[in-house]
Regions:
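Solvent-exposed coil/turn segments that connect beta secondary-structure elements
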Residues: 113, 121, 129, 143-145, ...
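Conserved, short, structured surface segments that act as functional micro-motifs
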Residues: 138, 162-235
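Short, well-structured beta-strand-loop connectors
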Residues: 115-126, 158-173
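Short amphipathic beta-strand/extended segments with alternating polar/hydrophobic composition
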Residues: 64, 80-89, 150-153, 201-211
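Residue-level detector of conserved, well-ordered beta-strand and adjacent loop positions
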Residues: 109, 141, 151, 174, ...
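Small beta-barrel nucleic-acid-binding modules, principally OB-folds
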Residues: 98-108, 142, 195-202
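Surface-exposed, glycine-biased beta-strand/turn segments
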Residues: 2-135, 179, 220-319
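Zn2+-dependent peptidoglycan hydrolase active-site motif and core
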Residues: 119-157, 178-190
Length: 319
């Protein structure tokens, strides 16, 4: 396995330009049901040329290491106020401040053109490019209520409905989306990695202050996928059709409500609904779980990268 070399246009997701401009205006001005994004001088702390320059050039920032930059924020500001890249109230799983206000995922900083692998077996439930919300994104339902979403990609190699195995090559990383465009070349190319359990965003790391909490990473820490990994059979989650339809019916945006209601089969409708209500939470007053059962945290995920290219992960604030 080797690094690819996507163009800057593909890496940043700039095409088609007219549509990207329209989407950029949503982030800056807001929409009928989406408040504008919030940023200030504290947002400049997200820039780091010592990491960004080599990664944009397709090289390691730290040899054979994934750099963990922004972590899941356990003190997120109300999303009704708008997506915030400010740092006003932040706490990562270690009790430190490597995150920002609205960050509900984990950022894996890797060289542009890194092969993206499936972190566990599952079914592809969403592929979409939205310049104002994370660029090109790929979501996989791994069964038992667990979905992962990888954002800021340059290219996706699978389609919705595909069944993929742990370690399968599913995409190529870049840094697509508006934040890349406005911060180039000081913004750090990365994969924004969301984990949703029973429809809600969760931190894949176990909180240090909660020793009873289980990590979602295999072995308790983020490790790349070995070439000879044993891959389980792909399957999706067991959705309750009445619960899914109730969440969709409560959506306040008519065009989104109609699109979700038309999706078949149930697995895809459930996956699309979870994806939509997490990327656009102000559209969904009903936050109930769409799953038939409640699922506990357990170690199921690898880093979505190959052990051929990476040995492990390091924290940006410890470099």
């Amino acid at each position: 396995m080797r690094f690819e070399r996507p163009s800057l246009v593909e890496s940043m997701g700039l095409s088609p330009p007219r549509e990207r401009f329209r989407q950029a205006m949503i982030a800056l001005r807001g929409d009928e049901d989406v408040p504008p994004s919030r940023y200030d001088a504290s947002s400049l702390k997200l820039l780091d040329p010592r990491l960004s320059i080599p990664l944009w050039r397709g090289r390691y920032a730290v040899h054979r290491q994934v750099v963990l930059t922004n972590l899941f924020n356990h003190r997120q500001t109300p999303i009704e106020l708008g997506w915030s890249v400010q740092r006003t109230q932040v706490e990562d799983f270690r009790g430190k401040a490597s995150t920002y206000d609205s960050h509900n995922g984990t950022d894996f900083a890797v060289p542009r053109g890194t092969p993206l692998l499936a972190p566990a077996s599952g079914v592809v439930v969403r592929v979409v490019s939205e310049f104002h919300r994370g660029g090109l994104k790929l979501a996989i339902d791994h069964g038992d209520g667990l979905i992962t979403s990888s954002a800021h990609l340059a290219r996706v190699l699978v389609k919705e409905g595909d069944r993929v195995r742990r370690g399968q090559h599913v995409g190529i990383t870049g840094y697509s989306g508006l934040d890349s465009f406005v911060t180039f070349p000081w913004g750090i190319p990365h994969v924004h990695f969301n984990v949703w359990l029973d429809g809600e965003p969760v931190d894949p790391f176990a909180r240090v202050a909660h020793p009873e909490e289980q990590s979602l990473f295999v072995g308790g820490r983020p490790t790349p996928i070995p070439r000879d990994v044993e891959a389980e059979e792909p399957r999706g989650s067991d959705y309750d059709p009445a619960r899914v339809d109730a969440i969709v019916a409560a959506c306040i945006t008519p065009r989104v409500r109609a699109r979700l209601a038309s999706i078949e089969p149930l697995l895809m409708r459930g996956g699309h609904t979870i994806f939509e209500k997490n990327y656009y939470p102000t559209r969904f007053p009903d936050r109930a779980s769409p799953l038939r059962e409640v699922h506990a945290r357990r170690p199921r995920l690898h880093l979505p990268f190959s052990a051929d290219l990476f040995d492990g992960a390091v924290f940006q604030d410890e470099l």
